[in-house]
């Protein structure tokens, strides 16, 4: 069987990464967290004292930035050059500025090429905002994952509490709404559902139920 490509897109905190990781393990595919790649570039800008809206300097930073994933339990580790930044890329500052960095054409072009290279050499589950529309337009299965703003804010709140971070629930709702607007209105590869993507609403659904539903869709599309 040739390499099989699964694209999972959707807004922030819809459950993409959680679902994609479990599916990749279940199917023995490579998990590609594209959001982590954009976060890593955003963090690299911070570490180099570059303003998040300085497109030219961030463009020049790309050639000096190696991003590496290493399998691990319970979470895949993310490396910026040789530094483990798995936790650091999830900080509030990176979260609130990654949309700006991800909107730059050169950043997207560079990372899309890296993502396609991985997909050309492996069967992958890739999640992000524009996988089915831009990165892997010929993906074998495309999923568009959604959930209500209230539910997504609750999920983010629980994640923050588990990390010892305290953020007001209403603030999280506003941040998610702002992120949705930025992601869906940017000029380059805006967040949008591919015409051939299957819509899966995770509101009120357990992780196991969503995984089972998508695994069934994938298995029905695999031709041996």
UniProtKB/Swiss-Prot annotation:
Residues that coordinate or bind ATP: 10-18
Predominant location category: cytoplasm
Catalytic activity: CMP + ATP = CDP + ADP; dCMP + ATP = dCDP + ADP
Entry's Gene Ontology cellular component terms: cytosol
Entry EC number(s): 2.7.4.25
GO biological process, one term: pyrimidine nucleotide metabolic process
GO MF: ATP binding; CMP kinase activity; dCMP kinase activity
Localization in the cell: Cytoplasm
Pfam families per UniProt: Cytidylate_kin (PF02224)
Key words, A-Z: ATP-binding, Cytoplasm, Kinase, Nucleotide-binding, Transferase
InterPro entries: Cytidylate_kin (IPR003136), Cytidylate_kinase_dom (IPR011994), P-loop_NTPase (IPR027417)
Family, per entry: Belongs to the cytidylate kinase family. Type 1 subfamily.
HAMAP family according to UniProt: Cytidyl_kinase_type1
Protein name: Cytidylate kinase
Gene that encodes the chain: cmk
